[in-house]
């Protein structure tokens, strides 16, 4: 199947690669089929979730654990059943990223992660009831915190040998 997209031009997609969001993504309820487009630059942790029904609709997504390793939330039994999750290893978590002109203001929506069963290609955007996670987590700030924590726990920071 050929899909004409705004951001990637004409791409060929395999029906088996289509990820189905039965409930859509909030705000985009009419779009239930997406393709994961991996960034060809392996050094860059941002990818795309391209709508199949609308070539102009694509979300920038990333793995939240890359910048927020302690990210933690529960997946309800209802969602486990709806996505037919049999094993946690079949689950992939992403967050939608907002990329403004000033890259320092780039944010990730940690309050509403995307969970995808990679085995059967079913997905859902969760809405977490959390005071800890927000819709706009500044990614570069989170990375900076990780680096500071890493520097504090390194042997050199603890007075270890070089």
From Swiss-Prot:
Subcellular location: Cytoplasm
Gene Ontology cellular component annotations, sorted alphabetically: cytoplasm
A biological-process GO annotation: bacterial-type flagellum assembly
Keywords from the named record: Bacterial flagellum biogenesis, Chaperone, Cytoplasm, Translation regulation
Signal sequence annotation: none
InterPro entries: Flagellar_assembly_factor_FliW (IPR003775), Flagellar_assmbl_FliW_dom_sf (IPR024046)
Taxonomy, superkingdom: Bacteria
Protein role: Acts as an anti-CsrA protein, binds CsrA and prevents it from repressing translation of its target genes, one of which is flagellin. Binds to flagellin and participates in the assembly of the flagellum.
Homology family: Belongs to the FliW family.
Subunit structure: Interacts with translational regulator CsrA and flagellin(s).
Name of the protein in its database record: Flagellar assembly factor FliW
Organism lineage: Bacteria, Bacillati, Bacillota, Clostridia, Peptostreptococcales
